[in-house]
């Protein structure tokens, strides 16, 4: 289950970013996950809960945006979404497509956090 190691890396990256920003607690982690990433969503959610235990991300929600598979069709000279990831053929002209544009990413997009500074709680 490589999702657990991905979750550990995600927590480590988010911890570093939160520490740099002086954040005490992260509440939401936004992740972009491509169709072809090979990551099982439910396993990643479970792994995130395990990996975040005892960190400033403990109890944080992992929001996953699924990124569809898009390829570049040289014949049509355009980017097209593939409805079936098993066939890398342009749905418009039927030509084989070799260049993937989106759909492979595992990207930490944003963090949401609680601001515990006295200035933030006073207003």
Swiss-Prot record:
Taken from the UniProt record, the cysteine pairs bridged by disulfide bonds within this chain are none
Q: Which residues bind Zn(2+)?
A: 73, 76, 90, 93
An annotated Gene Ontology molecular function: nickel cation binding
Its Gene Ontology biological processes? protein maturation; protein modification process
Q: Which UniProt keywords apply?
A: Metal-binding, Nickel, Zinc
Superkingdom of the source species: Bacteria
Q: Is Zinc there in the keyword field? A: yes
Q: Write out the residues that bind Ni(2+).
A: 2
Q: Which NCBIfam families match?
A: hypA
PANTHER family given for it? HYDROGENASE MATURATION FACTOR HYPA
Homology family: Belongs to the HypA/HybF family.
Give a short account of what the protein does.
Answer: Involved in the maturation of [NiFe] hydrogenases. Required for nickel insertion into the metal center of the hydrogenase.
Q: What's the protein called, per UniProt?
A: Hydrogenase maturation factor HypA
Q: Which organism is it from?
A: Roseiflexus sp. (strain RS-1)
């Amino acid at each position: 289950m490589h999702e657990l190691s991905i979750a550990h890396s995600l927590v480590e990256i988010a911890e570093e970013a939160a520490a740099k920003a002086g954040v005490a607690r992260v509440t939401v982690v936004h992740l972009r996950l491509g169709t072809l990433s090979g990551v099982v969503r439910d396993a990643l959610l479970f792994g995130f809960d395990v990996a975040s235990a005892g960190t400033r991300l403990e109890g944080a929600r992992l929001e996953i945006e699924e990124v569809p598979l898009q390829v570049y069709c040289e014949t049509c000279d355009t980017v097209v979404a593939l409805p079936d990831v098993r066939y890398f053929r342009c749905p418009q002209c039927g030509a084989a497509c070799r260049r993937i544009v989106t759909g492979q990413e595992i990207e930490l997009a944003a963090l949401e956090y609680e601001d515990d500074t006295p200035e933030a709680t006073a207003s």
